Amino acid sequence: MKMMDANEIISFIQKSEKKTPVKVYIKGDLKEVTFPETVQAFVNKKSGVLFGEWSEIKTILDENSKYIVDYVVENDRRNSAIPMLDLKGIKARIEPGAIIRDHVEIGDNAVIMMNATINIGAVIGEGSMIDMNAVLGGRATVGKNCHVGAGAVLAGVIEPPSAKPVIVEDDVVIGANVVVLEGVTVGKGAVVAAGAVVTEDVPPYTVVAGTPARVIKEIDEKTKAKTEIKQELRQLNPEK
């Protein structure tokens, strides 16, 4: 797994073309309208759909207003610097509504649940599950076979670039609504109880709880049984 350096992310955002992509449903005498190659136009003589940059499409609409009867614009971002990650080739289960930015690393058989938000530079290891509404900030790193509970937040670090990101090592279970602050490392096999606010490193194979989180015990067989990672939830269809 690769972690992006903060300066690489800053440079990427600085140099990226800021975009306002739109989808426009259009109706009118469209045989009279010429669409440039930079706009994807799926149209017939009377109606169609356009995909492209708003500034270009707005110019088309304004200059051809006498031919256009009506249109509806769908737009979900403005001057966006970071595109969404192309998910088609990723060998993981990613559910609807997850927001995953470009330059995120996702290991095989990971699971990203509904409405999870994964920012640029984050890394998710093989077989790890990011549950509903969880947030992984910029450069947050989750190891293999972990579970990040619903509503948990792993704080992001892009600026200042010298700051250390959150690192969650392998086989960690993080409960619902946990907050892990910048620079914290959660050690291998640890368990963070629901609702905890983690401000300091968590030793491996310990259970922490509270605000701020404190070690309450070492991992025992009872804890292992309660926090077992089920591989059945991470299985994908056989490749064809």
From Swiss-Prot:
SUPFAM superfamilies per the UniProt record, alphabetical: Trimeric LpxA-like enzymes
Key words, A-Z: Acyltransferase, Amino-acid biosynthesis, Diaminopimelate biosynthesis, Lysine biosynthesis, Repeat, Transferase
Catalytic activity entry: (S)-2,3,4,5-tetrahydrodipicolinate + acetyl-CoA + H2O = L-2-acetamido-6-oxoheptanedioate + CoA
Biological process terms in GO annotation: diaminopimelate biosynthetic process; lysine biosynthetic process via diaminopimelate
Pfam families: DapH_N, Hexapep, Hexapep_2
SS bond partners: none
The enzyme's E.C. designation: 2.3.1.89
Any one GO molecular-function label of the UniProt entry: tetrahydrodipicolinate N-acetyltransferase activity
Pathway: Amino-acid biosynthesis; L-lysine biosynthesis via DAP pathway; LL-2,6-diaminopimelate from (S)-tetrahydrodipicolinate (acetylase route): step 1/3
Job description of the protein: Catalyzes the transfer of an acetyl group from acetyl-CoA to tetrahydrodipicolinate.
Record family assignment: Belongs to the transferase hexapeptide repeat family. DapH subfamily.
Name of the protein in question: 2,3,4,5-tetrahydropyridine-2,6-dicarboxylate N-acetyltransferase
